[in-house]
Amino acid sequence: VLGVLSIIISGIMLKKFKIFTGDPAPFVMELPAYHVPTAGNVFRSMWERGSSFIKKAGTIILLSTIFMWFTLGYGWEGGAFCAVSDIDNSIMARIGSVIAPIFTLPGFGTWKSAVAAISGLVAKENVVATFGQLYHFVGEVAEDGSEIWSELAADFTQVGAYAFMAFNLLCAPCFAAMGAIKREMNNGKWTALAIGYMCAYAYVVSTIIYQIGGLITGELTFGIGTVVAIVFIALIIFLLVRKPAKADSTDGLRRMSVDAN
């Protein structure tokens, strides 16, 4: 629901900017007649999708997991670079500590949660593997996952967890999808704009969820974060109700020129 609603809201807001204005164009898609799929087609599709995920898991996810393992296992202790006994002294802890303040407003401003969120840009599946390494989820756990929840509760409130999931749902997809966006748009600037918008929109929505949700549930008190969330809400409402920008006769030519380049 959040994803579909975000698509509708984004479409309305972006249409108000001059760069996206233009005459509505009809979209016609010719659909073939529906048939019951054959067993061969089903298994072929299953094989293609399964092999694609295996290749992805064996390359991007594996390499990123190895990188996470190394940066979490090594760092500086006692003035020397070595295998660390405390994860807070690792290379990744230092990197995450620099990134973490950015995610304070959305409610996951610890270095562990910030690293997990960034790892989702490599592959969304990577967030789970990153959590496993950061919080030492090894061996078997109870059916209700009580061991996992007790570990995560130290870094996430209930509303903060929802904000974290919303951010990962709405932010830029994995590297493979970013590559597909680049191929379809055939323009580096438009690709950067699309990815930047998705990340910014995800940040705004997750901030609103955490700050307003925390205020309603009593997890937070009214403060600067609440004011920022209200400003974000007001900005979204303004972009939704404002009048669309008027397109001039050269807009289409400029867009065609940009796309061609």
Question: Can you name each region flagged by the protein language model?
Answer:
Residues 58-68, 218, 225-234, 260:
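Membrane-proximal intrinsically disordered regions of secretory-pathway and membrane-system proteins
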Residues 15-23, 34-81, 97-100:
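Long hydrophobic segments that form regular secondary structure
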Residues 65-199:
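Extended, low-charge hydrophobic alpha-helical regions
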